[in-house]
Amino acid sequence: MERRSIAFSPPDITELEIQEVAEALRSGWITTGPRTKQLEKNLAEYCHTNKVVCLNSATAAEELNLRVLGIGEGDEVLVPAYTYTASASAAIHCGATVKFIDSQKDSVEMDYDAMEAAITEKTKAVITVDLGGIPCDYDRIYQAVERKKALFQPANSIQKAIGRVIVVADCAHALGAERLGKMAGEIADFTSFSFHAVKNFTTAEGGASTWKSIPGIDDEELYHQYQLLSLHGQSKDALAKTKLGAWEYDIIGPWYKCNMTDIMAAIGLKQLERYPGLLARRKEIIGRYDAALKPLGIQVLDHYNAEHTSSGHLYITRVPGITEEQRQEIIVKMAEAGIACNVHFKPLPMMTAYKALGWDIKDFPHAYDYYHNLITLPLHTKLTDEDVEYVMENYKKIVKEYI
């Protein structure tokens, strides 16, 4: 078999995106402007929500979700131990205390019984993570927060309107995923998306916030609050100041700078037009991988079933019986064949920052067990059928030495 070079997750950029970016550059308007506003509108239609706010990262989106909710010092936020750092660091930025929750056995999802048991009078939010693009069991999550609503102590009008622990979804991987007929974005109370270069849908860097409409809370006012938080607390953005005589603005609060630019939005506008085809191609590749690898006893995620349709972001495999050292050997052998692999994720209690906060991976045995024999294969829309075959054949050959 002729050696190939298979990147892990390159962006899928075509002349459509390049031309739209060039038009944005020629327009003379390159910061937050008409293209950003159009992308927000298009994404809201796609997610079946009233409003979307485009920002410069998913981390900023999650942090602003928590800040809009008024979550801060003295509050607790429940976070899966098995996730990327942004899921937890956004809450820490706000001054809240993170409480990690172990995974279910042989699953990337939180142990929802443990999550429910962890809810106290201080708990304000639970961060759910649709890892790999697969929606969590939101029925169980909402059941848990409803059963514990008597403990909830609202600190402001929006918390009072929701009346229970708030479900804040980290959908960094999950734009386009569906669960029981609902799109990611309209399932959780608040949702953040990532448009980073490695994601299915990219604006190079970037992200977005959206939310379900809340009775008694005005969506336009919420949107305005995000605008203030994302642009120094400035009462007008640059586009609004272009109106005749409209130079003057106020600073409402000493806040943050995390707005999206029209150059980034230009990429996103064309990506969204192409997105149904990109998702379909990912589903094809996952189907081929599943057919080749499951008969060997390799464990994989269930991306598509009667309850949910994944966005197909990650192809996570688990090789039964291998050690961390053997996992590394397999990754190196794949790299020697020209195939880049990865691991998603090293549980946060294993990381220096979180160990320093007192967390110990020994308290999260299911998260560690899932991680220690996990290998993520390349899954992206730049893969040809021949590339997919090359990845499958090499992986089967290498893994057979260890099974």
Predicted features and spans:
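N-terminal "arm"/small-domain region of PLP-dependent enzymes with the aminotransferase-like
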Residues: M1-W29, P34, D250-I252, P378
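Active-site phosphate-binding strand-loop segment of PLP-dependent enzymes
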Residues: D106-T203, S209, S213-P215
